[in-house]
Amino acid sequence: MKILAIDTSSKLCSVAILEDTNLIKKLELNNGLTHSETLMPLIQKLLKECNLTLNDINLLVSDIGPGSFTGIRIGVASCKAFSDSLNIPCVGISSLEALAYNIKNDGIICSTIDCKNNNCYFALYQLNSGIYNVLHEHCAMSASDVVTLLNTKYPNKTINFVGDGIPSASSNEYLNVENLGIAGYKKFINNNYISENILPLYLKKPQAQIQLEAKLKEKI
């Protein structure tokens, strides 16, 4: 099965083609342009370098967030458009779940993504023999609250941190589009997806909206 994975959740635009869980090739680009300008040319370049066309793709996987609000919308919309026009399945994977796949050792995985002002997007997973089970659903909370939660619920456990939400504790900080594809493939073969239901995952309001609401409150 040939898989096209798309990640536009950060400044980096990343695409990859996999054969099941094996990477064929990936391309990443951060040239200062918007994802709406770079995504399609990057996909076309990737397909050409792999001697493939979109008709050869059997499964689409998109990062649904959390992350860049605009970037996520572009990636999800593109994935759904390909899915509808080519009649192939589309799987959505959260950034936090894809990050967890950076860790290969069994144990508890804390995935975090910085969302400014000492806050982070957060989710907790248990990896056991290649299976990633959710211990705590994705949410937005302060970095200090994440640490408190972990110390309270798992005081004697080793925690594997991944992502940039808690800089002092994190490693393997960046989402790998290859892992995004692998996570999507696993959901597909377990029939744990609904193509029509793929939607952006927003865990908090955009910063601009938060600032605007704060200014409006000051005027009241």
Language-model segment annotations:
Residues 49-55, 84-93:
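Phosphate-handling active-site elements
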Residues 39, 43-46, 50, 99-100, ...:
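Generic hydrophobic alpha-helical segments
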Residues 171-220:
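Acyltransferase
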Residues 30-38, 69, 73, 77, ...:
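Residues at secondary-structure transition points
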Residues 1-64, 140:
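N-terminal beta-alpha supersecondary unit
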Residues 59-90:
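DPxDG-like acidic metal-binding loop motif
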Residues 22, 31-34, 89-176, 202, ...:
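Surface "functional belts" at beta-alpha junctions
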